[in-house]
Amino acid sequence: IFLLGPPGVAKSMVARRLKLMFRGGTAFEYLMSRFSTPDEIFGPVSIARLKNEDTYERMTEGYLPTATVVFLDEIWKAGPAIQNALLTVINEKIFRNGQFSVRVPMKGLIAASNELPASGQGLEALYDRFLVRKLVGGIEDLSDFDRMISTADESEPEMDEHLAVSDEEYRQWQEQMKSVGLHYSVLEVIHSLKDKLEDYNRQLENADSPSDVALYVSDRRWKKIVRLLRASAFLQGNTEVRLSDCLLMVHCLWNETSQIDWVRDAVLTAVGESVRGYVLNLSGIETDLQALKKEL
């Protein structure tokens, strides 16, 4: 998940609360800077192992490779060495520690920044890995704002252990999600969105002075989107992805903030078209059934 917003809007609190969902969960937080090193994220190199065993290995306990939920602030300031290691962790859930590949227990990675990644800096691959992008701002509702400023700072909240998700439950859910079906109307929505994206980019190419950048969605991203839709359906107790789940794509398809309104309209239009088509199809089936009854 990538959170885009100014400082002081409780972005890091999301990660700290999220870890409570998992039994025995731990969180790792870090504020990136241009001078951040891999040691600060993945753990320092063990001098003893390097000296006595001639082995390059990090002491990872308490750092990203051992955390359940990770929060990285100012993510785009990470250097190339950190970026490359993060790509492997996100893609494969594996951290290469010296000559060993270690499976990480990470269930969620939340990154934040008050800006989007600069173009031409080699950050495109890392940005593409963050499936959900969300704008985060200050509290707008005045009653909520008043309650926030007048309430004493709370200690770390607690969750009943019986409600927390165990590693075994999480593994089982991951397997069960794979069996969630895709209704043909959901595939129609995805096809429609792909067509709309092509039209959007084509219009930009033909514009005399394009004011926006092309909206590219990789095949890998589409596959992850479908996985998200399946997760949404599963957690609602459904055996099939529904059109309402498709609304999540509003937060998955934009790359620039200037594209958010277009993406929202495109998703709502595609879902609406599919709903109308589905209803008309049912109406046609009902007419055929009535005609068949008369013949019988």
Region roles according to the model:
Residues L3-L4, G25-F28, K51-D54, I94-G98, ...:
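Active-site phosphate-binding and catalytic loops of NTP-dependent enzymes
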Residues A48-E53, V69-I82, T88-V165, W173-Q174:
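Canonical AAA+ ATPase core
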Residues K134-S209, N238-T239:
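Conserved C-terminal "switch" segment of AAA+ ATPases
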Residues Q203-K223, A231-L296:
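C-terminal engagement/docking regions of AAA+ P-loop ATPases
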Residues S33-P65:
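Short glycine-rich substrate-engagement loop in P-loop NTPases that contacts/grips substrate
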Residues F2-R34:
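Walker A/P-loop
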Residues V9, R23-G24, L64-T66, R103-M106:
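Short loop/turn elements that form and flank the Walker-type P-loop nucleotide-binding site
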Residues L3, S12, I41, D73, ...:
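Conserved RecA-like P-loop NTPase ATPase core
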